[in-house]
Amino acid sequence: LWGGGTLTLVKENAMNEKDEITDIAHEKYPFLHRVRALRDIGSEVKAGDLGGFVESESNLSTEDDMSWIYDDAIAAENAYVDQNARLFGKAVICGCAYVSQGAALSAEARAEDSAYIRGADLCGHARASGHSMILNSPDTGKAPVLSGTCVVYGTVMGDVHIAGKTVILSEERVSNDTPDTLILNGQERSVIRDSSRDELAPRQPQEKQKKPRNQGRDR
């Protein structure tokens, strides 16, 4: 749950019928082990498939969703993959990072410290650090994309692409609740305008409101 600036993870201790931790240890970090699917997860993961690495069962949701750790990706320490989020390639989440609501980390992207990733895509060598929040917009449903070697310590929300060597500081907030795509690449800023915004549509008729009667009062 996320609210009031405080993130609280609620993890069920019910029997895990989604995955199991194998004895296949990570070559560099032997305290990490691969997971194996116990059932089909979406259309891509079949029962028996090996996944990425975790430190404990608490790193990956055991709920009936499609969250999964692929390839050589890692979820370690108190980090948590939840609500259809996925890790690919050599992505890493660690510390108390929380990745949820269909978010995807690929290549060598990293979420660390207390980063909160909701619905966003991180690729390349992108980093989410500190108390950063990378969030989909509740208004448009669109989510940020982080790529290159960018680092985010602050808040990014909506259809925002952070690329190159861009750094978003902890006190900075970049929010886009429009249909356009906002692009930040180093010191450069640009916009990809949504084509639908250049079209005019007839105004929808509105129900006329009845005027209050004048009960003997002067106008």
What function would you assign to each model-found segment?
Residues G3-M66, D72, K90, C96, ...:
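Terminal amphipathic alpha-helical/low-complexity segments used for targeting or macromolecular assembly
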Residues W68-Y70, I74-A76, Y80-D82, R86-F88, ...:
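Extracellular beta-strand solenoid repeats
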Residues P138:
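Short, flexible helix/strand-to-coil boundary loops that buttress conserved ligand/catalytic motifs
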